[in-house]
């Protein structure tokens, strides 16, 4: 016979697995549609028209039209494509299901059109809303928070292809009774995360790791170097934190979302022309291209880091539906490669991983997620103790500092209301 604690844990196991699988399938379908549309917009269509896909005209035109298209969706869809992600944390309150079709369309258009945002926030919003709406109907005795946690865990597992990230994140956020062991509370979320990760793995494998030279033995000077790199990344990130609410307020002076996002798309196009196609899109595939390109110099990496960070701020401030974590990782990689090129004595494994740790910490203010992203992009067990030590001064630097999020105005513009 199972102990009552075990029966309690098993109670949500089946819903957790179902939510994890569904979370992954929604992500896969959205990413597949976005990939097909991206191929049409950036390969087939310019080839048919006899235009180079990396020509300034095409980059500016596609991003401007993408902004206009997303603006039309936000303006006219029911629920106005959900809340503005710039005003929301990664895991937020459930939105009405009526807003989800518009949100999914806006996300697909942004991903395919080259906007410098990732899928994580909208996918999280969609999965939470569906889990709460369906779960409340099927099992009304389970509260909304439980469904939110399961959907969040399933989505995190699906996004990163492993339940480890969910375990790390929820180990610090599940504040239950002290009489209930932590792993009892983690059981169902980890089931959801594992189901999401395994389902994603059946269709594709998220490829985060970079081919960076292996890091051997840790030395004391490496800790100092890593702390300096993380501090530089934090400084760069805090500039973006300062800019985001100000640019957001400026952009939202334009009351028409079609015009506002059209202007935002045009600015993104200009930034894309300056730094090239590798600075477009969510950043994961592009950072692989950046590392593989041996022709990039210190100034090239610096330009890519600055432009990608600027594009992230512009996209978020303009109201595009997307997340900030994936493009932030790209910024960290570019910054780390730049610092390694500038000071070759510091191994690239240290500069890249510590830069990712610093910039993701600014964006998420989540120590475990920052450590996880740094560790999966530069997978080297020798780095783990160094990253844990470097996290300490980085966390001190950010204590009490504002987050990369816009305070929600008392009365949002009509197109952002749900």
Curated annotation (Swiss-Prot):
Topology class, membrane? Multi-pass membrane protein
Q: Is Transmembrane helix one of the keywords?
A: yes
InterPro entries linked = Chloride_channel_YfeO, Cl-channel_core, ClC, ClC-type_chloride_channel
User: MF terms per GO, please?
Assistant: chloride transmembrane transporter activity; monoatomic ion channel activity
Q: Name one GO cellular component term.
A: plasma membrane
Q: Where in the cell is it found?
A: Cell membrane
Instruction: Spell out where the chain crosses the membrane.
Output: 10-30, 54-74, 99-119, 120-140, 149-169, 186-206, 223-243, 258-278, 300-320, 322-342, 343-363, 371-391
Q: Which domain of life is it from?
A: Bacteria
Q: Which UniProt keywords apply?
A: Cell membrane, Ion channel, Ion transport, Membrane, Transmembrane, Transmembrane helix, Transport
Matches recorded under PANTHER family: CHLORIDE CHANNEL PROTEIN CLC-E, ION-TRANSPORT PROTEIN YFEO-RELATED
Sequence similarity: Belongs to the chloride channel (TC 2.A.49) family.
Q: What is this protein called?
A: Putative ion-transport protein YfeO
Q: Which organism is it from?
A: Escherichia coli O7:K1 (strain IAI39 / ExPEC)
